[in-house]
Amino acid sequence: RLDKDLLARVVGAAQAGEGICVVDCTPETIPDACTHVVIVVAAEVRSAASAAQLLVRLDAARRRCVVVLRQRQWASLSAAEVERIVRSTVLAELPTLRGLTRAVEIGGLPQRLPAPLRKAARAVLEEVGA
């Protein structure tokens, strides 16, 4: 389990350098130092409902958030339906990218990201002003 205090120290050290710091963490361990939170939501009712609750908590804490919709082959919700559930705009959609999960597990992200992933990442970076 990821320790929130340790993560806060790591993020603090990373922010001392130049550039952008990206942290992949659970909702419970989002560091206070994060200026933006990207919530990846599967196109499913349960995931959208959880994201809606998280967005309410983060909004109450005055955290800036964006939503990225993760499509799956068996997903049942459209972007418009997810937007209604989470009461937030879907900034980008990420389709199922065949073979990407396995490639990342074996050797990390490829040098050249697949076009849909590049597009979603670019949208997030533009939104956060990077």
Name every feature range the model reports, one short phrase each.
Residues 1-20, 100-106, 110:
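P-loop/Walker-type NTP enzyme "switch/lid" segment
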Residues 3-7, 30, 46-50, 78, ...:
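Helical mechanochemical/support elements of P-loop NTPase systems and associated helical scaffolds
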Residues 7-12, 31, 55, 79-82:
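Short amphipathic alpha-helical segments and helix-helix/interface helices
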Residues 16-18, 25-45:
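Inter-motif core of Ras-like GTPase G domains
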Residues 23, 39, 67-69:
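Structural beta-sheet core signal
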Residues 30-31, 50-68:
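Conserved C-terminal guanine-recognition region of P-loop GTPase G domains, centered on the G4
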Residues 41-47, 95-98:
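Short, acidic/turn-prone active-site loops that include or flank metal/cofactor-
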Residues 60-130:
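C-terminal lobe/tail of nucleotide-utilizing enzymes
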